[in-house]
């Protein structure tokens, strides 16, 4: 890899993640690319997560924790972290997921070779208790705006963005699917999302999460189509059918 070592800001919203947050933080501490800062925004956790975060903030000066005064949702938490981020590159990692140790290094090299602004990678699934599942979510070579409307394949935990090219990023203030809306917003501006088809992250299937409830996820996707993207009913319906087909394929 080039000797240039850019700073990557890791954006992590946290809420009642006591059982998982240590795995998440350690996956960042173990990165082969050492030039990162991790900005964790805690959304009023009540389960002891804050006590754990305070300890990690003392252990490594690259870890910064922000405590929200009222429960506001992941969009507000991520935006607060993005406001404080100092890195040219930003990467997203939720408080129950993990990265492979060379994730940042490999993805940075991938982006610099292509001079691309927006990239994502493949990832694997794990059970709620951390047991690896025999399932790999592949990353297509590239996605345009129209592609992403039909195939919501981009895993938030795999995304890296070059803000020198995209400008500042802010997620829409909606409770769920704000990540999808953000990717669509970038792609709509003409950027292409480039996929690195290598497993560089692990996504935890938490039983009470929106993503684990397929019906809720589908409803929120429809909301993004109609209320955020303002798609005509017929186009939204067509995109939704394609989304549903691809969602089924992804789980096979």
Curated annotation (Swiss-Prot):
GO terms for molecular function: glycosyltransferase activity; hexosyltransferase activity. Induction: By phosphate starvation, via the PhoP/PhoR two-component regulatory system. CDD domains: Glyco_tranf_GTA_type. Pfam families: Glycos_transf_2. Pathway: Cell wall biogenesis; teichuronic acid biosynthesis. It comes from the Bacteria. Its EC number is 2.4.-.-. SUPFAM superfamilies: Nucleotide-diphospho-sugar transferases (SSF53448). GO terms for biological process: cell wall organization; teichuronic acid biosynthetic process. Keywords: Cell wall biogenesis/degradation, Glycosyltransferase, Stress response, Transferase. The keyword Amino-acid biosynthesis does not apply. The nature of the anionic polymer present in the cell wall of B.subtilis depends on phosphate availability. Under phosphate-replete growth conditions teichoic acids are present, whereas under phosphate-depleted conditions, at least part of the wall teichoic acid is replaced with teichuronic acid, a non-phosphate containing anionic polymer. The synthesis of teichuronic acid is accompanied by degradation of teichoic acid and reutilization of liberated phosphate for other cellular processes such as nucleic acid synthesis. Belongs to the glycosyltransferase 2 family. This is Putative teichuronic acid biosynthesis glycosyltransferase TuaG. The lineage of its organism: Bacteria, Bacillati, Bacillota, Bacilli, Bacillales.
